[in-house]
């Protein structure tokens, strides 16, 4: 069986499910969901931390033994993202960053030009960069070439719950990647998470699918099981697809 731990940079994680915190109704529900998910790495919007003092969320993650992964959510330019990452490094004492540079508020689609520019600057500044990108294999390769520790293509736009719109693109990114591939954004339900792993992704990052579910802790548990099931199925190897039926028992 393949390596069971997720390895990004110089760190390893037993869980292949990375959680986000956006959209949670309150910290009590978020805590239950995080515990149910089994996650060891959870994103934190540094702007949100600055706005509310951040003590409640950061204290919660610390108490649960979960590593915070600051992100640059809301940034619209490379300069803005780099500054936000540097502030996060000072505030949270980490050089890890989930890099987001968004083109507009309606689509929340990554701005490819600004994203690459920010990635280059942050890598040069010693950051471990995990960029949120489109499902374009060429852009994913470009980000990898800049020195990013992973690539994080979207399945579909953030918060839509549309699942994986272009499975073949994700497979192409996986096939060409020399770093971990994390499916990020668009997950709606457990089957989407399982499919991401079956397509070859090394991990899944999600937030809205859990925080906006009718029962967030139950959905978090479902997502954890789905990620594990998809990973195990990929490692086991699916049977080839056939045009015609084939009896499972030999004919006499």
Swiss-Prot record:
Origin superkingdom: Bacteria
Which cysteine-cysteine pairs are annotated as disulfide bonds in the entry? Answer: none
Where do the catalytic residues lie? 98
- Please tell me where 1-deoxy-D-xylulose 5-phosphate binds in this chain: 159, 185-186, 207-208
For this UniProt record, the keywords arranged alphabetically read as follows: Cytoplasm, Schiff base, Thiamine biosynthesis, Transferase
Q: SUPFAM superfamilies in the record, alphabetically?
A: ThiG-like
Gene Ontology molecular function: thiazole synthase activity
Q: What EC designation does it have? A: 2.8.1.10
The pathway is: Cofactor biosynthesis; thiamine diphosphate biosynthesis
Leading EC class:
transferase
> Could you say which protein family the record assigns here?
Belongs to the ThiG family.
Q: How does this polypeptide assemble, per the annotation?
A: Homotetramer. Forms heterodimers with either ThiH or ThiS.
What is the name of the protein in this document? Thiazole synthase
Q: Which organism is it from?
A: Mycobacterium bovis (strain ATCC BAA-935 / AF2122/97)
């Amino acid at each position: 069986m393949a390596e069971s731990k997720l390895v990004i940079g110089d760190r390893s994680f037993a869980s292949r499910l990375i959680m986000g915190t956006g959209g949670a109704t309150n910290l009590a529900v978020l805590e239950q969901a995080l515990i149910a998910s089994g996650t060891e790495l959870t994103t934190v919007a540094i702007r949100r931390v600055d706005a509310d003092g951040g003590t409640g969320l950061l204290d919660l993650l610390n108490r649960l033994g979960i590593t915070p992964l600051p992100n640059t959510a809301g940034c619209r330019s490379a300069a803005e993202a780099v500054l936000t990452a540097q502030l996060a490094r000072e505030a949270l004492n980490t050089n890890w960053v989930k890099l987001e540079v968004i083109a507009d508020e309606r689509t929340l689609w990554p701005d490819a030009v600004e994203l690459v520019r920010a990635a280059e600057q942050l890598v040069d500044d010693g950051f471990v960069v995990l960029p949120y990108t489109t499902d374009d294999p060429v852009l994913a390769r470009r980000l990898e070439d800049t020195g990013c520790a992973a690539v994080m293509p979207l399945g579909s736009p953030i918060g839509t719950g549309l699942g994986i719109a272009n499975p073949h693109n994700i497979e192409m990114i996986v096939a060409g990647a020399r770093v971990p591939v994390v499916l990020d954004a668009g997950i709606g339900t457990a089957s989407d998470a399982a499919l991401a792993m079956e397509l070859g992704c090394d991990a899944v990052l999600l937030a809205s699918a859990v925080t906006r579910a009718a029962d967030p802790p139950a959905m978090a548990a479902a997502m954890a099981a789905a990620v594990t099931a998809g990973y195990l199925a990929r490692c086991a190897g699916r049977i080839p697809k056939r045009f015609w039926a084939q009896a499972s028992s030999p004919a006499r």
